[in-house]
Amino acid sequence: MKQLLLILAFLLPLCAYPQLKEPFNGLEITSDNPWTGDLDCFVIETGWLVSRADPTRKSVSIETPLVYSATMEWEFEIRMDFKPSDQNHIRLHVYLDDQRMLGLKNDYYVQIGSNKKTITFRKHTATEKNPKILIEKALDVLLGAVDLKVKLTLENHKIWNLYVLEKGRFVLIGSCESEVSSSCKGGQLRFECRYSKTRVNDFACNYIIISDNISIEPEKPDTPEEPEEPNEPDEPLVLPRLLAIQPITE
């Protein structure tokens, strides 16, 4: 029994260790992971990946390889020093479901920012013009400059849950079902900044952690307890009348 416990104690940390951990605190963007793409449009500043892009372009991005599994978790922190919009926002492309045999390609991504001040989880099929919004939530934090931590989970190739950090705890903001193919073994994780000419710089990412295991389930929003229905008043207790005792007469 002791040997079994020792083996489990050794294996559990290995199972829980993330497959990708990017702190963005090295000398180069590629110090910890093999990022490719528009590397010349980003710099590392005090532990943040920060955009320094070309104003004539509408978007820049970097990407790194990722292995897919049935159950996954993505966690990351982003910052924008301005109010995001439809033109100026951040996307993290988390899963590219490339089913080549069927000619299907679905790009799943989290978008932080829109004209409606929302965070969304979207699915964009290559053959369609517009993405499908799977989860959408308006957040007060998106009314101005943004610093936000986000968590996304995938369960059994199908169930997606999106969380944001509020007051020190991850809170569920939405769930959906959208099945991905088990035959797709991996793809590219892509961090993308979309911008107008006046908002080229100061998109930033602090860290990205991706695991094949879902951490302890974050707390869900508090729901007000339904008031208990008042109990019906008990019927008054009726005592039997005592019979008058008559004196015995001879």
Segments (PLM) and residue ranges:
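Extracellular carbohydrate-recognition regions
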Residues: Y17-G37, P218-I248
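Flexible glycan-contacting loops in extracellular carbohydrate-active proteins
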Residues: I173-D202
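Exposed low-complexity, polar/acidic, P/S/T/G-rich flexible segments that act as propeptides
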Residues: T198-I216
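Sec-dependent N-terminal signal peptides
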Residues: L4-P13
